[in-house]
Amino acid sequence: MQLRTGAASVVRTGLGLTQSRCAVQSLTAVPLERRIRQSKAFYHNTKKNDSAWAAAVSVAGNIVNNAVTKAIKGTDGLPTIDPLRLVAGEMKFLTGNIRKLLGSGHPSLDRAAKYYTQAEGKHVRPLIVLLMSRATALCPKAPQRQQSTLQASAAIDTSISPLNILSDFNPSDATPVSIPADTDILPSQRRLAEITELIHTASLLHDDVIDHSESRRGAPSANLEFGNKMAVLAGDFLLGRASVALARLRHAEVVELLATVIANLVEGEFMQLKNTARDEKNPKWSEETLTYYLQKTYLKTASLISKSCRASALLGGADAATVDAAYLYGKNLGLAFQLVDDMLDYTRSEKELGKPAGADLELGLATAPLLFAWKTMPELGPLVGRKFEKEGDAARARELVLQSNGIEQTRALAQDYAEKAIEAISGFPDSEAKDGLIEMAVKTLKRNK
C-alpha cells in the first residue's frame, strides 16, 4: 500500500514499539529525538535544557524538515486517504446508537440530553477509536487477554443487574443498537466509540455552562436553550449512561481507564481556573508556565483520546507493545489537536469556527499562542495575572500575540506532536486503517474549525 509523501517517511526502525515490524523507510528529516528529547515535560518540572519551552524552540528551528510538513504538501500528487470512508459502516450508526443509549422517560431530560446529538458534529473521537480498532486488529495478540475480549464483546447490551431493578420507575432504558455486519471491528469496540462520544458531549454541556457559551456547532448552546441547571443535569445524565454502557463491557481495565478520563476532565477544568501554577497577580514568564498549560491540556483534551485508543487496543486483545503504542498515538494527537484549536481562536472568525472566536481571552484564559508571545513581551504578565478583566485587556493581548511569533511557535509544536503520533504507530502492520490514522494526524494540522 502506497502512503502519501511524508507518511511513509516518518516510519523508522529501531523504536522498539512492537515485535512485528515491517520493512520501513528511514527518515531523511532531522531525527525527532534530536529536536525534542522528552515526551513527559508536562508531567513534571524539568531542567532548562529539557523543558517544554526548550523543546518548542528547538522544534520551531527545525520545522522546515518536519516530516508532517512534507506530508501536508503532498508533492507526489497522490490522493489523500479519507479516514471516514474506512469506517463509514460503523459511523453511519453512531448517532442513532447514541440516541438509543440516551432514552429517558422524562421528556424534558430526553430533549436536553439528545440536543447536541441533533447537530452534525465532527465525531473525531469515535472516528479515531474505530480506526485504531481496525489498525490494531492485525497486530500481535496477548493470549491472557483473549477471555476478557470475548466477554466484552458477547454481552454489551445485556445488563449485569436485574432489569426490573435498573428500570424501576423509569419506563425507558437503553435499547439494543444497530450493528453492521462483516467487519473486523468488535461490538465492544463500537460501543467504546459511542461511550467516548457520550463522555465528550457531556463535557461540552458542562463546559458551555462554565464558559457562559451562547453557541455550539452553529446553533444556540444547550445552556441558552434549556438553562444552566438543565444543561448540567443533561451532562450528568450522559455520564451516567456512559458509565452503564462501560460497565456492560465487563472489562475492568477499560472501565478504570474511562472512569479516569472523567476525573481528568474535572481536574483539567480546575487547572484552567488559573493560568499559572501559583496564580500570581503580576506573574513573570517561566518555562513552567508552558508545562502547566500542557498538563492542563492533557487532562482536558488528550486524556480522553489517549485512553480511548488504549482501551480500543485492549478490547481487541492486543499485546502490551501495541496497547502502549495506541496510547502514545492518542496522547500526542490529542495535544496537537488542542494546540491547533487554541491557535484557531486567534486566526479564525466565529462564522468559520461555529462557536465564538476570541473566546479564550474573554474567559481569561492564556493559551499557547499567548504563552509563547509572553516570553518576548513581558507586558503581557499583568494582563495574564488579572485574567484580561479590565476593559481593553483582551484586545491588547490579542494585538500583542498577532505581533509576535506565538502562533507560529504553537503551530510548530502542534506539528511535532502530530509527528510523534505518527511515529508511535510506525510498527503497526501496513493497512488502510493505519494510513487513516496517519491522515488524521495530518488533517489535525490542516483543519480550520
From Swiss-Prot:
Binding site for isopentenyl diphosphate: K122, R125, H200, R217
Species this chain originates from: Neurospora crassa (strain ATCC 24698 / 74-OR23-1A / CBS 708.71 / DSM 1257 / FGSC 987)
EC number(s) recorded for this UniProt protein: 2.5.1.-
One Pfam family in the UniProt entry: polyprenyl_synt
CC cofactor: Mg(2+)
The protein's name: Probable hexaprenyl pyrophosphate synthase, mitochondrial
Keywords: Isoprene biosynthesis, Magnesium, Metal-binding, Mitochondrion, Transferase, Transit peptide
Binding site for Mg(2+) 1: D207, D211
One GO molecular-function entry: metal ion binding
